[in-house]
Regions:
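A structural signal for short hydrophobic beta-strand segments in well-ordered beta-sheet cores
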Residues: 68-71, 137-139
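Core beta-strand elements of the Rossmann-like FAD/NAD(P) dinucleotide-binding domain
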Residues: 77-84, 88
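Flavin (FAD/FMN) cofactor-binding and adjacent substrate-gating region
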Residues: 1-63, 70, 143
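Active-site substrate-recognition segment that forms the wall
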Residues: 87-179
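Hydrophobic residues embedded in beta-strands of well-ordered beta-sheets
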Residues: 74-77, 146
Length: 179
């Protein structure tokens, strides 16, 4: 489906196969089939700058580097009125809505992604279950390296998410189990 929707912007073909066509990765015998896939890799900072530039070209007034604490659903921020408020603060949305007594239609869990860049080049992406068998891990090409990660660990607060030594060990051990 991704390939169909992407059309000419397709990054690569996903496939299910019985072997890997790359000397860098050799699956252990008990892994008979694998899913190879391609995922986008983006520069979030560059994308953000591009969107800000485009918005300014459209005469949209943007207020950057301003801490907003008090707002309502009518467009009021402190003592100013705005036609629209875009709350683009990721995991902090839940806390800001609660602080301003605004009921959300969605419940937000705080999760963190754990990612490692390992010194091993890959030309395709893999997704596999980790050693605990309840989480999936991905290994994606990233420049001349491999990006190894997962995004399924709940945390109690979004501030300063850090990868733990246990999570590093989990990712590496899980990756090593299939090679």
């Amino acid at each position: 489906l991704y390939e169909f929707l992407a059309g000419s912007k397709n990054l690569g073909k996903s496939s299910i196969s019985n072997h890997i066509k790359n000397d860098q990765f050799v699956l252990k015998d008990n892994y008979k089939t694998y899913l190879s896939f391609f995922d986008g890799s983006m520069d979030d900072d560059s994308l953000g700058r591009e969107l800000i530039s485009l918005a300014k070209e459209l005469n949209i007034e943007i207020f950057e580097f301003n801490e907003i604490k008090n707002f309502d659903t009518e467009g009021n921020i402190d003592k100013h009125y705005f036609d629209k408020i875009i709350l683009a603060v990721g995991p902090w949305s839940k806390m800001l809505l609660e602080q301003n007594n605004i009921k959300s239609q969605k419940d937000i869990d705080f999760i963190k992604g754990s990612h490692l860049i390992i010194n091993r080049k890959s030309e395709f992406g893999l997704m596999f279950s980790g050693i605990c068998k309840s989480r999936y891990i991905f290994a994606l090409p990233y420049k001349d390296f491999t990006l190894l990660g997962t995004t399924e660990e709940k945390v109690s607060h979004p501030e300063l998410p850090e990868i733990s030594k246990n999570e590093i060990k989990y990712l590496i051990d899980s990756f090593n189990q299939i090679l």
